[in-house]
Amino acid sequence: MGQTKSKIKSKYASYLSFIKILLKRGGVKVSTKNLIKLFQIIEQFCPWFPEQGTLDLKDWKRIGKELKQAGRKGNIIPLTVWNDWAIIKAALEPFQTEEDSISVSDAPGSGIIDCNEKTRKKSQKETESLHCEYVAEPVMAQSTQNVDYNQLQEVIYPETLKLEGKGPELVGPSESKPRGTSPLPAGQVPVTLQPQKQVKENKTQPPVAYQYWPPAELQYRPPPESQYGYPGMPPAPQGRAPYPQPPTRRLNPTAPPSRQGSELHEIIDKSRKEGDTEAWQFPVTLEPMPPGEGAQEGEPPTVEARYKSFSIKILKDMKEGVKQYGPNSPYMRTLLDSIAHGHRLIPYDWEILAKSSLSPSQFLQFKTWWIDGVQEQVRRNRAANPPVNIDADQLLGIGQNWSTISQQALMQNEAIEQVRAICLRAWEKIQDPGSTCPSFNTVRQGSKEPYPDFVARLQDVAQKSIADEKARKVIVELMAYENANPECQSAIKPLKGKVPAGSDVISEYVKACDGIGGAMHKAMLMAQAITGVVLGGQVRTFGGKCYNCGQIGHLKKNCPVLNKQNITIQATTTGREPPDLCPRCKKGKHWASQCRSKFDKNGQPLSGNEQRGQPQAPQQTGAFPIQPFVPQGFQGQQPPLSQVFQGISQLPQYNNCPPPQVAVQQVDLCTIQAVSLLPGEPPQKIPTGVYGPLPEGTVGLILGRSSLNLKGVQIHTSVVDSDYKGEIQLVISSSVPWSASPGDRIAQLLLLPYIKGGNSEIKRIGGLGSTDPTGKAAYWASQVSENRPVCKAIIQGKQFEGLVDTGADVSIIALNQWPKNWPKQKAVTGLVGIGTASEVYQSMEILHCLGPDNQESTVQPMITSIPLNLWGRDLLQQWGAEITMPAPLYSPTSQKIMTKRGYIPGKGLGKNEDGIKIPFEAKINQKREGIGYPFLGAATIEPPKPIPLTWKTEKPVWVNQWPLPKQKLEALHLLANEQLEKGHIEPSFSPWNSPVFVIQKKSGKWRMLTDLRAVNAVIQPMGPLQPGLPSPAMIPKDWPLIIIDLKDCFFTIPLAEQDCEKFAFTIPAINNKEPATRFQWKVLPQGMLNSPTICQTFVGRALQPVKVFRLLYYSLY
C-alpha cells in the first residue's frame, strides 16, 4: 500500500503541487493523503486520465460524472473524495476559457457561505485572513461600489501583500478603453472562494469571465524609450498578466521508472524546499521599475520585461533525454511540454533549446518544420477577421525588428503562444536517424501486443502525418478498429458507432480491450476450454443478479450456493451403500438412480429408467459410457454397431406403446477424452470410441448437433461405409474458443439404406468419410522437372500414354499408335507448331475417353507422324486440369545441387542423419579458370610463419581469475579440454595470467573468451591493414561476388613461441576441491589487440594465387 501511494505521489507530483498552491490562495487546506486517495480513485474508475486527462474543468467534470456512474453500480466512493473533488472543481472554474464564461445573469441567485460565527469577534486582521470552511457552489461575483477592494485583494493575493507589507492599490474601472487591451477593472475581479464579507451583485456591469489577475502594481508597460516599443510593433496590452494556468500536459506512465515526475518539476520542488523562489520565474520576467523611471506622477508603478536564459541543468537534462530516449519519446515529450508551458519562451529560447539538445540533422529538421509552420500560421493570421498583426519575422525571431533578445522579450502573449504551438508541432515531426515515418495504414496490432500499445503507436504516427486535428481524430478512431487484431475487434465491435457523444471513443475501446492478450486473458481462455464454462462474467462486472441468491456477479447456473446444496444432497444420497446389485444392470452394487450402464450383464443394451412414460435412456451423454463395460466376446473395444442397432429393434415395450416406425436409425456420438479448440486451428480428428462395421446394406452419415453450429463449432459432414471396421472419428473445427468433456454428445450417426444404381458391380472399398469406388482421395498431379509430364488415358477401351501439352489446341495421336481398324480421314486443316506436319489425319468418329482419374470425356483427335501422343486443351479442360505454382523454398538450381550433396526434402543438410556428413571435396575443373580451379589447387602455399608481437614492458601482468557459478565452470572445463585436444592450448606455468569466462549463444552452445584488457595495454599496436571499405562508385557494375566463410580463423594462425606464455589463464576447480589448472594459448586468442591485423596478413597470403591470375579484384576481410 505504501508503494502504491509513493507511485501515485511521484506520478502526479506536478498536479499535487499546483492544487495545493491554488487551494492555499483560496484559503482551503487539503492534506496530501486525501489528494493521493483522490487520484487513486480517479485512476481506478477513469483509466483514460493518466494518458489524456488534464486539470481542465471539462476533464474534471467528466471525472465527477464517471465517479457518479461507478457509485450507482455499487462501488464505494469515500465521502472525502467527493469533498475534495468538489473543492478542486470550485477552484478550477475561474480558469475556464472565455467561450465558456458565465454571465452574472446566468449565475445562481445567491451563494451559500457558511462561515464560523467566532470570526465576527476577532480583529480586523484576523477577519481578513479567515476563509469559509464550506463552499456549496462557486458563485460568479460582480463588483459594486460597496465592495471592500482591500479585503478582496487580500483574499486572492495574501502572499503578495505579505511580501510588500502594504495593501494593494487598486485601479478604478476604466470605461474608455476596450476590454481586450485594458486591465480588468478592480470591480470586476472574480471570486470563487469568498471571504466572510459577501460581494453584492451589480447588474449594470457587463459579464466577466473567470480569471485571476495579479496585483495592480504589476502592470505591463514597454520600455520608456518608445511608446509602442520598436517600429512595427503593435501596442502592448497594459492589463495584468494572467495567473499561471493549471498543468495541461498529460501524464505518461511509460516514462523511465526512476524519473516518474518531470525533470523540471524535480528541480523546481528542490529549489522551493531550499528557499529559492527564483525557480518559478520565467525566462522573460516582469520586474518593477525603480521609482521615477517610466512612470509619470499619479500613475501606478510600471514593470519592465527582462530576459533570463535557461539554466545549464535544464539544457543538460534535455540533451541527456534526447540522447537516451529519443526526441519524440514519451518522456521527452512530457519534459518539453512542461518547459514550453511553464516558461514564456521566445524564438531565441526555442533555437537554443533545439541546438543544445538535438543533433545537426535533427536540428535541420526542426528548423525546416518551424519555417513551414510559420508560413502556414502567417496565412491564417492574414485570413482572420480582423487580421492578426503577427508576421513571419516575429514568429522566427529574425529581421530588423525581432532579431535581438530585448526585442523578442516584448512580444505579445498571442505571438508567444503561436511560437510555442509551431515549435511543438515541428519537434513532433523530428525523425530519429535511420528511421522513416510509417503510414498509419501499416500500423497494425500484433497477435500478442496489448491494445493500448497499439493505439499509442497509431496516435504517434497519425500525429506526425496528419496536421488537421479533427481529421487525425477520425482516422485514429477508424484505424483503432480496422487494424486491431481479431480478438480486440470482437471486443470493440459492439461499441462501434454506439459510444455516447460525451465519451471518448478511444478510451471506451481501451476499456473494452482491457486484459486481452495478457496472462489473465490466456488463463481465462484455457479455463474456459477445459471446463466449458464461459468466464466472461468473472472477468468483467456482471450487471444482473443471480435468481437463486440475489447476489451480483454470476448467473443461477453458476451460483455457489446452489452448487453447495447439490453437493450436500449428492453426499447424503451416496453416503449409504446399496443393499444389493443394481436392479437395472444386475452387474454392480450401486443405486439404480446412479446407474450409467448401457448394457446389462448379458451384453444387451439398456434403455429407460423403468419409472414412468415412454422408455428413456438414463441421464448419460454419449452413445457409450466413458469407461464402458466390455462384455465377453469383445476384446478391448465396444460392440460393433451392427449388434448395437440389432439390439435397438429388440428393446422391451412399456405401457403397451408400439415402438416408433422410422426408416432411419441413429446413435449419438460423444467424445471419450477432453477436447479444447481455439480459433484459427486446422480441423482436428476426435475419437468417439465407436467402431464399425455398420449393419449390412446401410451407409452411415455423420451430422453435427445444431446447438454447436449456432456457437460457431462445425462438425464436418462425413460418410462411413458399411464395411469399415475401424474407429469412427469426427472432424471438428471451431471459430470460437470451445471445449468438451468426456462423454459430451456432439454429433449423430444416421444409418441410411444403401441403394445400388443400375447393375454396377464395382466393388466398394471400405473407408471413413468416403464411398469412392476407386478408393482414391487425390487426383493425378505432376511436378515440373527434367522429366516430361506424361499421363495415361483410355480411348475406346485402349490405353494411350501421352504428353500433357497446355499449348496444344487439340489432342494428337501418333500415327504409329493409331489402330488400323479405326477409321480416319484427311484433315481439312493443318497443324502448326515448332514445325509443320506434312500428313495430317483426323478421326472420323467422336471417341469416348477416360482421363487419368476416370474423368469421362469425348475427343476427336488429330493423327500425324509424331514420336509421342499429345493431350491438348480440348481434353485437359474436360478433365478439370489446373496449373498451380507454389512458391518454392529453394530455386531449382539450388535444389539440384543440394540433392547431389545428400539433401533430403523436409529435413535439409546437416549432421543429424538428414544429409551427407563428409565435407565437400575440392573438384578441379580443367576447362575453366577462376577461384577454385587449377591454378589454386595446384599452387603450393608455404606454411604460415608466426608474427612476433612487440611489448612495451617485460614485467609480467597478473589479473586474478574471478569466481564463476557451477554451470559456467562445468562448461569452461569442457571447452578447455576440447581446445586442448585440438592443440590450441597447452599446460602453462607462466607468471602472466588473464581472467577467462564463458557466454552462451542463442543456439545453446557455450563460447570461451579471455579478458585480455590488461595484456592489451602493454602490447604495441600494429594498426589495421585495411582501415576502410572501397568506394562502391569505383567498382565495375555486375562484378562476380564470392563469399568465403572462414570458420575459427584465429585458431588456424599460430602465435610466436616467445609470446605464448603471455596469454596464460587459470581454470579453477568446482568448489575449490582441487588445485586450479593453468593453460596458455598457442594460436591467436580472440580479444587480443593485434589479432585482426595478423589475421588480415595471413588471409592476404592465402589469397596470393588469386592476385596472380586476377589483377583486377577487390578483397574485403
From Swiss-Prot:
Active site per the UniProt annotation: D805
Lipid-modified residues, N-myristoyl glycine kind: G2
Catalysis performed (reactions): Processing at the authentic HIV-1 PR recognition site and release of the mature p17 matrix and the p24 capsid protein, as a result of the cleavage of the -SQNY-|-PIVQ- cleavage site; DNA(n) + a 2'-deoxyribonucleoside 5'-triphosphate = DNA(n+1) + diphosphate; Endonucleolytic cleavage to 5'-phosphomonoester
Main subcellular location: membrane
Role this protein plays: The products of the Gag polyproteins of infectious retroviruses perform highly complex orchestrated tasks during the assembly, budding, maturation, and infection stages of the viral replication cycle. During viral assembly, the proteins form membrane associations and self-associations that ultimately result in budding of an immature virion from the infected cell. Gag precursors also function during viral assembly to selectively bind and package two plus strands of genomic RNA. Endogenous Gag proteins may have kept, lost or modified their original function during evolution. Early post-infection, the reverse transcriptase converts the viral RNA genome into double-stranded viral DNA. The RNase H domain of the reverse transcriptase performs two functions. It degrades the RNA template and specifically removes the RNA primer from the RNA/DNA hybrid. Following nuclear import, the integrase catalyzes the insertion of the linear, double-stranded viral DNA into the host cell chromosome. Endogenous Pol proteins may have kept, lost or modified their original function during evolution.
Zinc finger (CCHC-type): 544-561, 580-597
Family assignment from sequence similarity: Belongs to the beta type-B retroviral polymerase family. HERV class-II K(HML-2) pol subfamily.
Highest taxon above the source species: Eukaryota
Mod. after translation: Myristoylation is essential for retroviral assembly. Alteration of the glycine residue leads to a block in the budding of particles and an accumulation of Gag inside the cell. Specific enzymatic cleavages may yield mature proteins.
Ranges where the record places region Disordered: 165-264, 598-629
Keyword set, alphabetical order: Cell membrane, ERV, Hydrolase, Lipoprotein, Membrane, Metal-binding, Multifunctional enzyme, Myristate, Nucleotidyltransferase, Protease, Repeat, RNA-binding, RNA-directed DNA polymerase, Transferase, Transposable element, Zinc, Zinc-finger
Gene expressing this chain: ERVK-9
Name of the protein this chain belongs to: Endogenous retrovirus group K member 9 Pol protein
Example of a GO cellular component annotation carried by this entry: plasma membrane
Domain Reverse transcriptase: 58-195
Organism: Homo sapiens (Human)
EC number(s) stated in the UniProt entry for this protein: 3.4.23.50, 2.7.7.49, 2.7.7.7, 3.1.26.4
InterPro entries to which the protein is assigned, alphabetical: Aspartic_peptidase_AS, B_retro_matrix, B_retro_matrix_sf, DNA/RNA_pol_sf, dUTPase-like, dUTPase-like_sf, dUTPase_trimeric, G_patch_dom
Compartment annotation: Cell membrane
Gene3D superfamilies per record: 1.10.1200.30, 2.70.40.10, 3.30.70.270, Acid Proteases (2.40.70.10), HIV Type 1 Reverse Transcriptase, subunit A, domain 1 (3.10.10.10), Human Immunodeficiency Virus Type 1 Capsid Protein (1.10.375.10), Retroviral GAG p10 protein (1.10.150.490), Zinc finger, CCHC-type (4.10.60.10)
GO molecular function, one term: aspartic-type endopeptidase activity
Annotated ranges, domain Peptidase A2: 800-875
Protein's GO biological process: proteolysis; viral translational frameshifting
Annotated G-patch domain residues: 890-936
